[in-house]
Amino acid sequence: MSELNITSSQIQGDVTVTILHLSGHPHGNTENQLLDRARQAYEDGSKYLLLDLSELEILTSAGLRAIHKIFNMFTPQSDVEIIHQHSTEPYKSPYFKLVCPSPEIYYVLNIAGFLQNILIYNNMEDAVNSFNGD
C-alpha cells in the first residue's frame, strides 16, 4: 500500500485557486494529512480549492470522508443554510471542486453521491476557469 503524497500550487484565473495534487493511496492513516493540508490552505486565506485526483490510485472510505469534510470546510455557513432551505434542489459548490479522477474513482464518487454537490472536471484548464468568484 503506497502512502498519500500531497503537493500544493496556486493558479490565478478569475480568482486565485489553490490546488492540492494527490498521488498514492488515501487511507485511514493518511486521512488527517489531507485534512491538515486543506485546513492550512483555508486558514491561509484560500477560498477556492481544487483537488487534483489524476495520480490517485484508489479512493477508500477514508478518502471519501476526507473529501466530505473538506467540502464542509470550504462551504460558507450562508450556503449551508441555503442547502437546508432548498433540500430538494441540488447544490453545486462554487468553492470546492475535483479534477481528473480515473474512471474507477469517478464511479466511487458517483455511487457515494458526491456528484450531487461537487463539480468534477476532466482537465485542469476547465476546472480552474470554472472558479469565478460569484
Q: Model-derived features: where do they sit?
A:
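Amphipathic alpha-helical interaction surfaces in cytosolic regulatory modules
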Residues: 28-117
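Short beta-strand/loop segment at the start of cytosolic alpha/beta domains
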Residues: 1-21, 26
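Short acidic-hydrophobic, aromatic-tinged amphipathic segments that line or gate anion-handling sites
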Residues: 118-124
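Short acidic DE-rich linear segments
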Residues: 132-134
